[in-house]
Amino acid sequence: MLRSALNLATLLGLSTAFSISHRQDASYIYIPIEFLYGADSRVTTNITFGSSPSSHPITVVMDTGSANAWIWQSGALVHWGSPYLFDPGPCNLTVPNTTTYNPALSLTSHTQNISSEYVYAGNSKIVQGNLYSNDTLTFLSSPTASNTTSTSSIPNIQLALENSAILRLRDNGSCAPPPSYDKGIIGLSPYIPTNSTAIQGPSFRQNLFSASRIKAKTMVTWFNAPPSTLSTLSGGLLLGAIDTSKFSGPLVRVQNVVESGQVGYYIAKPNITFNGQELVPDQNTTCLLDSGTHADYLPFAPLSALPSRFFNSSGGQLVDENGVVGYNGTCDSIPRDLNLTYTFGGFTSGKTIKIDVPLRNYARGAMLNGGDDGVCLLNLEVGGCTFGAPFYSGAVVAVDDERGVLALARGGVSKDGSGADAASLKIFGTGETFDFV
């Protein structure tokens, strides 16, 4: 969904990847993912598009909060400088060739003249294009990953090629510095056959299923244990399979409370525990699971007493920076065993699942503008309810769109940098899925 960092921004100054024998009707795809160290980072992967020798890896958002897959076409323009909808404004830049794809240079490409337009973050980002391309996508593994090849390639994947974007950002008259913008997005939300403009395609996951490259409409994401330093977090994404070594305890099914017209996976709000104090959120909302968002948003009604209770119960460890949560100390000083714990009710009566997210995983390099240098600004805010990349770093999220199943487990247990483990891999044939309680 790529939620805009409105509050935070104001403060900022396969072919198969394993050599394993499985029955012939079973197929799966493994994609390495990362949560880079950076204030606006989301869950991403590195992809080379096409077969041109001059192709460069491009860091693309893997977004459970949107449905469509796109990349920049060569010569694309990004416009900004106006706060008004569909007004390109006075400023623009050309997307560098190193982060664009030119199908004319790839012997494996096939293009079609199809128009596309995608809207993100409450109409603050609009991208447009008039070309689709089918080509080979090569996903680059982490150089420290174990039990995987260095790359995995999938042929004949369809993407929209975008040639322009409008960012609703005011400018100070200089058009400098240029804003950050997405280099590409692979939407991962469920495929819904409809004419809705929110789900117009191409659908990465549905196209893989339709081509029988995977036999089940499952997706599982995980992150490994965090490194000792504040840096990139590594993980993986499996389509059509699960790696049972990536979580502790059972996968617990939770209710997917998505409503008609919504895109993505929605769950009921959890209870939130910090410093031994459990709080029951008071905002009337459901919560979006959105790997394409840089932060988590806690469902405390901003004008109620609950935000103050949250900060007061932290024992002085957390401070309120205009709705953004800060740690009262340097980022490096955050204890490694200090967690935010989210307790979700299960789909089955009496079942619950607790997800521990290390507070250090929220420290992604955001800086206060004119604030206290002794405060570490976190990718964590109060109001609304979205669980973005930080939440994903502490959870295993498993979905089966065929059955409407959404399940959670405790993640962050496998070795930093590790890929999928062949010995713990379960690949799904037709009609199969993961175990859950």
Per-region residue spans from a language model:
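Active-site beta-strand/loop microenvironment that shapes enzyme catalytic pockets
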Residues: 64, 281-309
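Fungal secretory targeting signals
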Residues: 1-25, 437
